[in-house]
């Protein structure tokens, strides 16, 4: 209930307005993509617990429950204001479910249990583990990037400089 209450407070709209917390998708095609994936999940038995509406490129924050591992909303990177919530008997089972993906950008773990924090860090197949914050959290000096099909390399000032330059070597033998 607390998560749902927080999601309900998100103001959607013009990103230039101070009260806006959720701006538009990058383009119409991206908004249509997430809309179709959510609709497909619901048609396959998922429960739309909140959201799911779209006005142009604005897509409501969306919570899906009772999804299956095979649904597109679980097998693809959403890059949208949508989340699937699953119940698991153990923390380890939840980590296995997360790893059962071709992707591994970043993951969030919401816990006060330090054992869970270190277990997640050791076992999650992702480029970064964020504890008690959103998975998109980053600072410019942090390496940001994924593993598996989420890409290679890292972003961040240092990493961007290395990626955007081409080293060149000169060996001069004057003998």
Model-flagged regions — what are they?
Residues 8-12, 55-175:
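Conserved C-terminal structural/oligomerization subdomain of aldehyde/semialdehyde dehydrogenase
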Residues 1-69, 131:
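ALDH superfamily catalytic-core signature
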């Amino acid at each position: 209930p607390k998560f749902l209450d927080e999601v309900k407070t998100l103001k959607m709209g013009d990103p230039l307005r101070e009260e806006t917390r959720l701006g538009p998708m990058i383009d119409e095609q991206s908004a249509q993509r997430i809309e179709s994936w959510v609709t497909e999940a619901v048609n396959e038995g998922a429960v739309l617990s909140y959201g799911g509406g779209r006005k142009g490129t604005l897509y409501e924050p969306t919570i899906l429950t009772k999804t299956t591992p095979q649904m597109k909303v679980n097998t693809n990177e959403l890059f949208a204001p949508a989340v699937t919530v699953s119940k698991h008997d153990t923390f380890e089972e939840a980590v296995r479910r997360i790893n059962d993906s071709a992707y591994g950008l970043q993951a969030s773990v919401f816990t006060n249990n330090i054992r869970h924090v270190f277990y997640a860090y050791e076992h999650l197949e992702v480029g970064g583990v964020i504890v008690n914050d959103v998975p998109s959290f980053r600072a410019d000096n942090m390496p940001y990037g994924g593993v598996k099909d989420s890409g290679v390399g890292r972003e961040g000032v240092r990493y961007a400089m290395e990626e955007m330059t081409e080293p060149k070597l000169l060996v001069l033998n004057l003998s």
